[in-house]
Regions:
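C-terminal peripheral helix-coil segments that are non-catalytic and often amphipathic
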Residues: 1-5, 102, 141, 145, ...
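Helix-turn-helix
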Residues: 20, 24, 28-62, 66
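Short amphipathic alpha-helical elements of helix-turn-helix/winged-helix folds
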Residues: 24-28, 103, 176
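Hydrophobic alpha-helical connector segments
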Residues: 66, 80-112, 134, 166-173
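Amphipathic alpha-helical packing segments from all-alpha helical-bundle domains
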Residues: 73-81, 113-116, 123-157, 168-172, ...
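Helix-loop "lid/cap" segments that line or gate small-molecule binding pockets
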Residues: 98-105, 116-125, 212
Length: 217
C-alpha cells in the first residue's frame, strides 16, 4: 500500500472515531444532562479510556463546542442551500423559515442541545473564546447574509420598500422559527402538545414576514 493511501485511510479512521465520540457525547447529554456530562462518561459509552479521548479532543469544553458546531454546520448547509436556490427576497425569507423548521423539527434533541443547553449549563461545561466566535460567525453570513442580499436586490429594483431592514428581518424570522420549535418541544416534554399543528404555524410565520415586505409593511 502506498504512503498516500495509508495516510488517507488513517485520516478516514480518525474522522470516523471523531464522529463516534461526538455521537456518544450527544447520548450522554440526552440521558444525563449537562451535570452528568464528563469525559469519563463519554469514554465508558465507547468503551475507551479517557486518555484516548484526549487524542481527539483536548478538553470537555472542546468536545461540547465541537458537538454544537457540528450541528450548526449541518443546519447552515441545509438552510443555506435552500436560500441559495431562490431568486427573490420573499422566496429567500420563506425558504429560510421552512428549511429551519424542517431541519430542527426532525432533530428536536439537536435543537435543545444547541440553543438551550449552553444557557442552562450551570456546570460551566463550555466557555466561548474569540476563536470560537470567529468560527461561528460565518454561519450567520451564509443564512442571514444570503437572505438580506436578495431582499436588498429587490429593494434596489423597487419591488420591496427601502425602509425594510433586510438582515434584521432575516434574523428575527429565524429566531421566530426557533422560538416556535422550542415551545413545541417544551409542551411535548410535559405531555401537553400544542393545539396548533407545526405546518400551520410555519405558514403563519411565512405570511407574517411576507407582509413585512409589502408597501406599508
Amino acid at each position: 500500500m502506498s504512503r498516500p493511501r495509508r495516510q488517507a485511510l488513517k485520516e478516514q479512521r480518525h474522522d470516523q472515531v471523531r464522529e463516534e465520540i461526538l455521537e456518544a457525547t450527544m447520548s450522554v447529554l440526552l440521558r444525563k444532562g449537562p451535570g452528568g456530562f464528563t469525559l469519563n462518561a463519554v469514554a465508558r459509552e465507547l468503551q475507551l479510556t479517557k486518555a484516548a479521548l484526549y487524542y481527539y479532543f483536548d478538553s470537555k469544553e472542546t468536545l461540547l463546542f465541537e458537538l454544537i458546531y457540528r450541528g450548526l454546520d449541518r443546519q447552515t448547509q441545509t438552510v443555506g442551500d435552500a436560500v441559495e436556490a431562490t431568486d427573490t427576497g420573499a422566496d429567500a425569507l420563506e425558504a429560510m423559515i421552512r428549511a429551519t423548521a424542517g431541519y430542527y423539527g426532525a432533530r428536536m434533541d439537536e435543537l435543545r442541545l444547541t440553543y438551550m443547553m449552553p444557557q442552562a449549563d450551570s456546570a460551566g461545561s463550555m466557555s466561548m473564546t474569540d476563536e470560537r466566535f470567529e468560527r461561528l460567525r460565518p454561519f450567520n453570513d451564509r443564512i442571514f447574509g444570503a437572505v438580506a442580499e436578495r431582499i436588498e436586490a429587490d429593494q434596489k429594483a423597487g419591488r420591496i420598500p427601502g425602509h425594510v431592514p433586510a438582515r434584521r428581518l432575516a434574523f428575527v424570522a429565524h429566531t421566530s422559527v426557533l422560538g416556535m420549535l422550542l415551545m413545541e418541544g417544551l409542551v411535548e416534554s410535559v405531555d401537553d402538545p400544542l393545539l396548533h399543528a407545526r405546518p400551520a404555524m410555519v405558514d403563519e410565520l411565512v405570511r407574517a414576514f411576507h407582509a413585512r415586505l409589502l408597501p406599508g409593511g
